[in-house]
From Swiss-Prot:
Tissue specificity as recorded in UniProt: Expressed in brain (at protein level).
Localization in the cell: Endoplasmic reticulum-Golgi intermediate compartment membrane; Endoplasmic reticulum membrane
Family: Belongs to the NAT8 family.
Lumenal face residues: 57-227
Chain ranges of the N-acetyltransferase domain: 69-217
Coiled-coil intervals: none
Organism, as annotated: Mus musculus
Keyword flag Transferase: yes
Purpose of the protein: Endoplasmic reticulum (ER)-membrane-bound lysine N-acetyltransferase catalyzing the N6-acetylation of lysine residues in the lumen of the ER in various proteins, including PROM1 and BACE1, using acetyl-CoA as acetyl donor. Thereby, may regulate apoptosis through the acetylation and the regulation of the expression of PROM1. May also regulate amyloid beta-peptide secretion through acetylation of BACE1 and the regulation of its expression in neurons. N(6)-lysine acetylation in the ER maintains protein homeostasis and regulates reticulophagy.
Catalyzed reaction equations: L-lysyl-[protein] + acetyl-CoA = N(6)-acetyl-L-lysyl-[protein] + CoA + H(+); an S-substituted L-cysteine + acetyl-CoA = an N-acetyl-L-cysteine-S-conjugate + CoA + H(+)
Entry membrane topology: Single-pass type II membrane protein
Name the UniProt record assigns to this protein: N-acetyltransferase 8
Stored PANTHER family: GNAT FAMILY N-ACETYLTRANSFERASE, N-ACETYLTRANSFERASE 8-RELATED
Length: 227
């Protein structure tokens, strides 16, 4: 098993961090596309539109061409939420990681390093408006390079955030992940996270049925933890 270490983000990591994160998100596009093809509304679209063209024009060739363009359109729909998400992240908090995380009290950004290369990332920062009486930390940007999965890196990065939350006196760690990100969903359940709900970001994510799962990991108080 290849060795790795978890450490705090440094400015020299930026390009590799962006690459690991972007690739990690966009690799879910094929899964989203296959999922979209199984939806009843998609199957209805693929059946009705070509049939209508045959009935109107009498041309099977036009129907085949129509199916080809429908598949292109469906690929575009499946990929759009993931590309939008990556673009939004790179233009907001990940545009300046030091400013967004390392310069903010109670926040952090860590990388997993193996062989001198960044192979994983994770970030955390305080929830702005937590429930009354709770101090919550939100986990963000968990991603591991596809060539380094199965080595426990994602679990180690998540544990780093949990330990940070304990040390900082947080009451909960919360996060949101996509239903189609089955590796992440399985990881969080195995580590004791509890599902609190599901949601859609917008009409596009509803249309392609890419829902988000909300998780929480309750922590003992700092005082209890020290005991």
């Amino acid at each position: 098993m290849a060795s790795f270490r978890i450490r705090q983000f440094q400015e020299r990591d930026y390009k590799q961090v962006v690459d690991v994160f972007s690739r990690g998100m966009e690799e879910h596009i094929p899964t989203a596309f296959r999922h979209l093809l199984t939806l009843p509304r998609t199957l209805l679209l693929l059946a009705v539109v070509p049939l209508a063209i045959v009935l109107v024009s009498g041309s099977w060739f036009l129907a085949v061409v129509c199916i080809f363009f429908l598949f292109l359109f469906l690929w575009f729909l499946a990929s759009k939420p993931w590309k939008n998400y990556v673009s939004k992240c790179l233009h907001t908090d990940m545009a300046d990681i030091t400013k967004s995380y390392l310069s903010v009290r109670g926040s952090g950004f860590w990388v997993a390093e193996s062989g001198g290369q960044v192979v994983g990332t994770v970030a955390a920062r305080p929830v702005k408006d937590p429930p009354l009486g709770r101090k919550q930390l939100q986990l963000f940007r968990l991603s591991v390079s596809s060539q380094h999965r199965g080595q426990g890196i994602a679990k180690a990065l998540t544990r780093t955030v949990l330990q940070f939350a304990r040390d900082q006196g947080y009451s909960d760690v919360v996060l949101v992940t996509g239903l189609l990100q089955q590796g992440a969903v399985t990881l969080y359940y195995s580590m004791g996270f509890q599902k609190t709900g599901e949601s859609f970001v917008d009409i596009l994510t509803w249309l392609v049925d890419v829902s988000l799962i909300h998780f929480i990991y309750p922590l003992p108080s700092a005082q209890k933890y020290e005991l």
